[in-house]
Regions:
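C-terminal His-loop and adjacent cap/lid subdomain of alpha/beta-hydrolase
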Residues: 25-709
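Bacterial N-terminal signal peptides that target proteins for export
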Residues: 1-9
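Bacterial N-terminal signal peptides
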Residues: 10-19
Length: 709
């Protein structure tokens, strides 16, 4: 990691991170950027706000007059300008009046990026044609911006609606193309927004490219009304923006396709929706690129439509990871988080890789194992969680392979560009760490990215052994054969040993969620269905891991509410209802004029009735605080489990990438050991075993925010 800058954050500083203020002016004139930070403007344009000068004033950009760009803003006493034509690098915006003067430096970057994520990943495969945007205009995968309209039909959608096999760009079930020049269709639906307005369900759909990603922005808008801009918002928009993040985890080297922005639950209530292909972890699992892309798309949104009252994140699995990591590492981009089936961060790779190692080891031991014993060692409710092809190495691009195997490239990457140890050793390496090479840097010996991957001293199956679910011979042999990975991600006999620099980078740069940044002051509504028994990695205890980390970092997790749904059937609280709760929570905070701290406000201003809860299969709501091993009906209905690290003694925070070691000691085991057995364990663990009563090696809280690479 080579961060050029980092910002140390306080609650006060957060409020101005995305509204970059000028130096204090002697007579009260002030300039600020609404669309982004002043030092991270993109695409040659920025939306700026000034206190309205008394009488005449003059505004210049790099010495050129831009006074006419300023027009009255929504807030009394302010002027807003969309300042365009910025040159790459530093620009000076200045405003003068009899009231005083103010000067603001704007630093502009190309709309193709990068801004803070480091050098662009190469090779990079364009996919604009697959997205229906035509051939790319340049090597940065640029496409022309396209604006079209669609509408919601009152006709019943076809059976099945739009399935997974639908063509890219196909409209979701119930939506049809709308021709503004034609007569209104007879099946045009009406909808009532959160503001109580009943309007025609017509959606403006903008698609284009930003930061080499394909983006889409949608909102209710009648095309017979004036085109929306920062001074004339669509009268059907409720002023809020929902940013949707997609799941998965893959190494990138391609543009990818975005998730859908035609989300009925959100659009029907008047919310604007934004998505981008590089905010889908299945296209690229680099959370820094995700944050950068989101920042740039949001800046474009503000330049075109005006600043939203709130920006709310939503998305499941990898989409949840992006929200949590963005709130920690790039605070100010999201005002509220709505993660579903969440994980706290990308360090989930440890759980995934442990599964593949265990799956391999169980097939390599002389001892026999039944599935209950395997499950006990893994920590999960069922061994199916690990043996599933997505978690093991059953498919070439399974999640396990995507984490460590350099050859696990997406099919969109031509074989001539992809890494092959024999035929193309200089090709694109498609594991997680090489995807994040701008953050971790390269190992000078191998040329591959440094890895924060380690299982030295981990006693796999420790709790299962202590509880007599497995015997000593099984415990010993498993830990003798568990192994690790070579530089290309192939399983070898030697355990993984993390690069010391990579460990430090992982914690300091925020690749591990440590509850920093804005994670103590943003509202979090964490929802999930109960999938533990289905053999699904998205299990219940992940929300508890995040709760434990927030509590460890901040002394409380009062800004997080968790809702637990039954494993089957329709969720008792629909996404639109969840969004309404989040919006009310944010509205309450905005109206709170007390002198309380931001952390106190977010805890105090929850909507009435919004609290930890679960629902029975029959639909009964049970209000109970989230606990890992406590009593209560929710834990009886939906027991929480663990992963292999916790089953080996790691804490619930599950945030130790490399454990501190201690000597093997017979007193640490519940089953009695003979001197020969102790000697065998010492041979199996020559460096010692994990001491989880101590912090991990290099473990620390995130060091500042808004890192550049």
């Amino acid at each position: 990691m080579t961060p050029c800058t980092r910002v140390l954050l306080s609650a006060t500083a957060l409020s101005v991170l995305l509204g970059s203020y000028s130096a204090a002016a002697p007579r009260g004139v002030e300039l600020r950027v609404l669309s982004s930070r002043a030092d991270m403007v993109t695409g040659g344009a920025a939306l700026v706000e000034a206190d309205a000068p008394a009488g005449k004033f003059n505004a210049t950009l790099n010495g050129e007059d831009v006074t006419k760009s300023f027009r009255p803003g929504k807030t009394p006493g302010t002027l807003i300008a969309r300042v365009e034509g910025l040159k790459a690098g530093k620009n000076i915006l200045e405003i003068k009046s009899v009231k005083g003067s103010a000067k603001l430096e704007l630093v502009d970057y190309p709309i193709t990026g990068p801004v803070f994520s480091g050098p662009h990943q190469k090779p990079f495969v364009c996919q604009t044609e697959q997205a229906g945007l035509g051939a790319p205009l340049d090597e940065e995968c640029t496409a022309k911006t396209v604006v079209t309209y669609v509408y919601k039909s009152t006709d019943p959608p076809p059976a099945g609606g739009r399935g997974r096999g639908a063509a890219p760009g196909a409209l979701p079930a119930g939506f049809k193309a709308f021709d503004p020049s034609a007569a209104r269709p007879a099946d045009l639906a009406q909808t009532t927004t959160s503001d109580g307005k009943t309007v025609a369900y017509i959606v403006r759909r903008e698609r284009g490219t930003i930061n080499r990603a394909i983006y889409e922005i949608t909102m209710l808008h009648n095309p017979s009304d004036p085109a929306p801009d920062p001074w004339t918002a669509s009268r059907n928009w409720n002023g809020r923006l929902v940013y949707s993040f997609g799941g998965g985890c893959a190494a990138g080297y391609r543009q990818g396709l975005p998730g859908g922005a035609l989300t009925d639950d959100f659009l029907s209530k008047g919310y604007a929706v934004a998505v981008s292909s590089l905010n889908v972890f299945g296209n690229n699992c680099d959370d820094v690129i995700s944050s950068e892309t989101m920042m740039m798309v949001k800046a474009h949104f503000i330049n075109e439509y005006g600043a939203p009252v709130h920006t709310i994140g939503t998305g499941g699995s990898g989409g949840a990871i992006q929200q949590y990591m963005m709130a920690q590492n790039y605070p100010g981009l999201l005002d509220g988080l709505m993660p579903q089936i969440s994980f706290p961060d990308n360090a989930i790779y440890e759980s995934v890789i442990d599964c593949s190692l265990l799956d391999h080891a169980f097939g390599s031991t002389k001892a026999s194992w039944n599935d209950d014993q395997k499950a006990a060692v893994s920590g999960y409710a069922t061994w199916k969680t690990c043996s599933d092809g997505w978690m093991s190495r059953g498919t070439a691009t399974s999640l396990a392979n995507n984490q460590v195997k350099a050859v696990a490239c997406n099919a969109a990457i031509p074989k001539t560009l992809a890494f092959d140890p024999a035929s193309n050793p200089s090709g694109a390496r498609c594991d997680y760490f090489d995807d994040m090479v701008n953050v971790y840097g390269k190992d000078s010996k191998t040329g591959a990215a440094r890895r924060a991957l380690d299982n030295v001293g981990v006693q796999y199956g420790l709790k299962a052994f202590n509880s007599k679910q497995i015997n000593f011979d099984q415990f010993l042999e498993l830990n003798q054969v568990i192994g690790g990975h070579d530089v290309n991600g192939e399983i070898i006999a030697t355990r993984d040993a993390a690069d010391p620099a990579a460990l430090k980078i992982a914690y300091q740069s925020g690749r591990v969620d440590t509850g920093g940044g804005s994670l103590n002051i943003v509202p979090i509504l964490d929802t999930r269905g109960y999938f533990d028994m289905a053999g699904n990695l998205h299990d219940r205890f992940r929300s508890m891991v995040t709760r434990a980390r927030l509590t460890a970092a901040n002394g409380t997790a009062d800004n997080q509410v968790t809702l637990m749904f039954p494993p089957t059937g329709t969720a008792p609280v629909r996404p639109g209802e969840q969004l309404a709760m989040m919006n009310q929570w944010l509205d309450n905070i905005a109206k709170d004029t007390s002198n309380a701290s931001a952390a106190s406000k977010v805890a105090h201003d929850k909507p009435a009735g919004l609290t930890d809860a679960c629902w029975t299969q029959e639909g009964e709501k049970i209000v109970e605080p989230l606990t890992y091993d406590g009593k209560g009906r929710c834990n009886q209905l939906y027991p929480a489990h663990a992963d292999a690290a916790i089953a080996a003694g790691a804490p619930l925070t599950d945030d130790i990438l490399k454990c501190a070691l201690k000597p093997v000691n017979a007193k640490d085991y519940s089953q009695p050991l003979t001197p020969d057995q102790v000697a065998q364990l010492k041979t199996a663990f020559p460096q010692g075993v994990c001491d989880y009563n101590r912090p991990g090696i290099a473990q620390q809280r995130v060091d500042g925010v808004w890192h550049r690479y």
